[in-house]
Amino acid sequence: MLSKQVRLLVITGLSGAGKTQALQSLEDQGYFCVDNLPPSLILKFAELCTQSQGKVTRAAIVCDLRGGEFFSSLAEALGDLHREGFHYEILFLEASDEVLVGRYKESRRRHPLSPSGGILEGIQMERQMLTELRGVAHKIMDTSNLSSQQLRHQVAESFGNEQASGHLAVSVVSFGFKYAIPLDVDLLIDVRFLPNPFYVAELRPLTGEHPQVQDYIFSNPVAQEFVDKYLGLLEFILPYYVKEGKRHLVIGVGCTGGQHRSVAIAERIGLFLQERSYMMSVKHRDAARNRKGDKSK
């Protein structure tokens, strides 16, 4: 049956237990995510996923008190999913009363079941109302002693695929400093200290993707030593980014105009990442701009 091709994860549980962080983690794993979906729309949502021509194979939704219809209709919606042949799992998040009270006080938000105050009373009321739903959950996570980052990592380990949870998506972008540093860069490399092919007439119209330009740059011992040491640094730090739960890293490589040196170094970094099976992309932001006639490199 077509509908069985979509894996649906329903996230629910106590208010303040970390459902938003869990959903964000799943989004990083490639899930199509919807927050605060009313139970009456769950079946329709699942049907739409099956009509995506394979673009949506995993989806996650959060159903909680904000949905308005409350959980009395959630059981009915899940029953409809089962009858229609959809595979779904329930992730139930909870935490101790003490921890939840502390989180509400820290955020200065009101509990949805106690709009006039009385945080603890609202928590206890909600816990009682969710007893039956908790009993049918496929997985229960107690977030009392978890930081947001630890929760995201635990969700990724439980519901992410092996490739997404074990690898980091790395974007390498070369650029020219005179056109400004990309705003989303995490790691920045300035390679303006390397020999500049711009001052070699036959290399000037080429970019750092061309073998002649790369040979010129890496024939310099300093350039080769720099690349070797930087790749060694990446070899060391990337696994720690993965362990910490980071899913996307942007490495910016800049030279004056973004045509020669930064492009060549970015290409070498991209090859390194590809050889180690990281999800990666290389973009040369300013190389084409310079080839159109900008004389300052």
Swiss-Prot record:
Q: Which InterPro entries does the entry link to?
A: P-loop_NTPase, RapZ-like, RapZ-like_N, RapZ_C
The record's listing under NCBIfam families reads: PRK05416.1
Specify the species. Answer: Desulfitobacterium hafniense (strain Y51)
Pfam families xref list: PapZ_C, RapZ-like_N
Q: Which residues are involved in binding GTP? A: 64-67
For whether the record's keyword set contains Transmembrane, the answer is no
* Protein task: Displays ATPase and GTPase activities.
- Family assignment from sequence similarity: Belongs to the RapZ-like family.
Q: Where are the transmembrane segments?
A: none
Give the protein's recorded name: Nucleotide-binding protein DSY4845
